[in-house]
Amino acid sequence: MATPVHDDVIEFAGDYRLKSLVITNHKGEGFDSTQRGVDIKRLMTELNIYEGIYKSAITGSVVITDTINLIGRLPIQGTERLSFKLATPGAHEAAHLIDFTERSGHPMHIYKLTDRQQISESVQVYTLHFCSREFLRNIRTKVSQS
């Protein structure tokens, strides 16, 4: 019999708690105008977040096993936002949470879709790459000497 997972107990190194992983289109909607986004946590296979002292932005990727035709129904164009909140088990203070939600004002932005593979007629696997707002700002801003 499996033991229940407790939110306050670290099960293994690198353990984290993720309540939801919500993708929102450029209109701030999910599949239709009545939804505020689509929770894709159950479609997620892998989540990676990268930050470095020599990088000016946070980047990451999420591997999706798509059984609901998310690409076609949303559709994914590269202008979507990805919202989520991570916490280490046992961390309850706001200072210990990693908050990339719409409410905090710092959602991630999807900028690329790679490694798309059709597994079966109704299942495909792909990787969504996301970044912080600063990454997009650095790409779009041109600095010139006057």
Language model features with spans:
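Conserved, well-structured core segments that form or line functional sites
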Residues: 144-146
